[in-house]
Curated annotation (Swiss-Prot):
Protein name (database record): Hydroxyacylglutathione hydrolase
Keyword Nucleotide-binding belongs to the record: no
Binding site for Zn(2+) 2: 58-59, 132, 170
Enzyme Commission designation: 3.1.2.6
Family: Belongs to the metallo-beta-lactamase superfamily. Glyoxalase II family.
Subunit structure: Monomer.
Keywords: Hydrolase, Metal-binding, Zinc
Name of encoding gene: gloB
PANTHER family to which the protein is assigned, alphabetical: HYDROXYACYLGLUTATHIONE HYDROLASE, HYDROXYACYLGLUTATHIONE HYDROLASE GLOB
SUPFAM superfamilies associated with the record: Metallo-hydrolase/oxidoreductase (SSF56281)
Length: 252
C-alpha cells in the first residue's frame, strides 16, 4: 500500500492510499475534494472508500463532492459520529477491522479531541492515521473530551511499534517542538529534531509522517514519566501531567 500526502486548506494533510495491484484508492480525512480528485486522475486510480477519523469540517469537507464523483463508495467513521459524517455508510467501534486491498486496519477509539475520534492502524505495513489526536511533536486540543480521555488515548497509541509511520492531519510540527523545547531544554533528541524541522519548514518541506519512536522520545504529550515534564507540570500522575501540559500549550 502506497500513501500519497496531499496539501489541503491552510495546513491540512489528506492521505490517498493506493492499492497498486487493483489500481484503487481510499482517502483519509478529505478536507476538500479537489486535490483528491486531481490526484486520482494523475495517479490513474479509482476511489473505493473514505476513512474519516472524526467529524470536524476540515476532515470531512470533501466527502459530499467525492460521493458525487464516485457514488456508492464506502464511508467509514465512528459509530459515535452518526449523523455528523456526510455520507457515512459504516459505523465503527474500537477493535473493528477494515480492509483496503490486501491490507487491514484496526480501529482504535481515541476520544479526547472529540467524543467519537478514531484512528486507523495498518499493522501489516506499519501506518497509523491518527487525525487530530496525535500530532508530530504534539496533540490535538480538547474540544469535546477530557484530559483523562486524551491521556488514555495517547497512551494506547504510544504502545504501537516504534517504526510505525505516524500520519497526522496537520503541519503543526515546528510550533509543537518549539513548545516542547521550552519544557525539556536538556532533551538532546528533541533539540536535534527541532533543528531538523526548522530547516525543513524553511524550505517548505513537510514533516509528516513521523515515527512512533520519534514521538516517544520528543513529544511531551507522550512523556508524562519525564521528571523534567513532571516538574514543569507540578504533578506526577500521568493524567495530571498531561492536563497541565495541555493547558500550557493552549496558552503558548
Amino acid at each position: 500500500m502506497l500513501v500519497h500526502r496531499l496539501n489541503a486548506l491552510k495546513d491540512n494533510y489528506v492521505f490517498v492510499l493506493e492499492d497498486e495491484a487493483a489500481r484503487t484508492a481510499a482517502v483519509v480525512d478529505p478536507a476538500e475534494a479537489r486535490p483528491v480528485l486531481e490526484a486520482l486522475v494523475r495517479l490513474g486510480l479509482k476511489l473505493v472508500a473514505i476513512f474519516n477519523t472524526h467529524h470536524h469540517h476540515d476532515h470531512v469537507g470533501g466527502n459530499r463532492e467525492l460521493l458525487e464523483a464516485y457514488p456508492g463508495i464506502a464511508v467509514y467513521a465512528s459509530r459515535r459520529d452518526r449523523g455528523r459524517i456526510p455520507g457515512q455508510t459504516v459505523e465503527l467501534e474500537d477493535g473493528d477491522t477494515v480492509a483496503f486491498g490486501c491490507e487491514r486496519a484496526r480501529v482504535i477509539f481515541v476520544p479526547g479531541h472529540t467524543h467519537g475520534h478514531i484512528a486507523y492502524h495498518f499493522a501489516g505495513c506499519g501506518h497509523l492515521f491518527c487525525g487530530d489526536t496525535l500530532f508530530a511533536g504534539g496533540c490535538g486540543r480538547l474540544f469535546e473530551g477530557t484530559a483523562r480521555q486524551m491521556q488514555h488515548s495517547l497512551g494506547r497509541l504510544r504502545e504501537l511499534p516504534g517504526e510505525t509511520q505516524v500520519w497526522c492531519a496537520h503541519e503543526y510540527t515546528l510550533g509543537n517542538l518549539r513548545f516542547a523545547h521550552t519544557l525539556e531544554p536538556d532533551n538532546a533528541e528533541l533539540a536535534e529534531r527541532l533543528r531538523t524541522v526548522e530547516v525543513l519548514r524553511a524550505r517548505k518541506i513537510a514533516t509528516v509522517p513521523s515515527t512512533m519512536a520519534a514521538e516517544r522520545a520528543t513529544n511531551p504529550f507522550l512523556r508524562w514519566e519525564s521528571r523534567q515534564l513532571q516538574r514543569a507540570a507540578g504533578a506526577i500522575e500521568p493524567e495530571e501531567v498531561f492536563a497541565h501540559l495541555r493547558a500550557l500549550k493552549d496558552r503558548f
